[in-house]
Amino acid sequence: MENKDGFLVINKDKGCTSHDCVKQIRKLLNTRKVGHTGTLDPEVIGTLPIAIGSATRFIQYLPQGKTYIGQIKLGIRTNTDDIHGEIINQKCWPKISDEKLDQYLNKFRGLIKQIPPKVSSVHVNGERAYKKSFNNENFELAPREVKIDELILMKWDQINGIIELKINCSAGTYIRAIARDLGEILNSEGCLLQLKRISACGFHEKNSIKISDIKKGIDQKNASNFIIPTISALNHISTLILNKEEDINFWQTGRAIKFDINYFNEGNNFDNKKPIKVVDKRKMLLGIGFLNKELTNINPKLVLNAK
């Protein structure tokens, strides 16, 4: 396969780790330069964007929002905050209407503080929390601020104590923590029953593909059709077009470009804190830059094909 730069949107199966997916893609495409955009727990299914080749350098510039559909089981608390952990407490759940339950969900909308599950990849004194947990070490995790942009009650099964939610949230949000904390707020217990990620970093499940289908594509010589060009993943970023060879040469040798609003696509917003994608007149991606504080120059931050 000739073009190995861009993003593959994997539809991850249950039981497979994010790193397992990366290893399989490395082997299939015969390249070491592969990385995922954010870990999915093994039991979580759905959208896992994977960067290939030079696209790995652009992961930090992707949109950070993620959307999940999950089910929470009330009445059960586990040591992992999901149904697969060891049960540490059980408690009846309340009889409650959809309307009242939705009012409780207001506590999780907007900017909130949450304590990550102890079985998580959060670092504690240089070590992953899950390792400390498996070694039965005593430790505490500090609350972290996350943002829940959208929290929709999809279904409430009173008989079985199962809540189905759609959650649009910032990177770093733990849905398991929401399950645990919602159980406490309802004077019960709660754990995550199942979870599917339907979008991440600007990629949606409708564009995702099973790894088994990639294998078939390689056999049929059309696997490159599955790769999304890096520039297509950066549509949310303002675009600077360099038409002059002199400017392109300046850029590729790491020198600043004089800011000219005429170089920008119409309607673009810009300031010195937002990244700018730089392209040539053929719309080929050249890299990422930032305006200086004086708004006079665009300084290279990431340069493709540097000289």
Curated annotation (Swiss-Prot):
Q: What are its E.C. numbers? A: 5.4.99.25
**Record: active site:** 41
Q: Which CDD domains match?
A: PseudoU_synth_EcTruB
Q: Which InterPro entries does this entry report, sorted A to Z?
A: PsdUridine_synth_cat_dom_sf, PsdUridine_synth_N, tRNA_psdUridine_synth_TruB
Q: Which UniProt keywords apply?
A: Isomerase, tRNA processing
Q: Which GO terms describe its molecular function?
A: RNA binding; tRNA pseudouridine(55) synthase activity
What GO terms describe the biological role, i.e. biological process, of this protein?
A: mRNA pseudouridine synthesis; tRNA pseudouridine synthesis
Q: Which PANTHER family match?
A: PSEUDOURIDYLATE SYNTHASE TRUB1, TRNA-PSEUDOURIDINE SYNTHASE
Function summary:
Responsible for synthesis of pseudouridine from uracil-55 in the psi GC loop of transfer RNAs.
Record's protein name: tRNA pseudouridine synthase B
Q: Which organism is it from?
A: Prochlorococcus marinus (strain MIT 9312)
Q: Which gene name belongs to this protein? A: truB
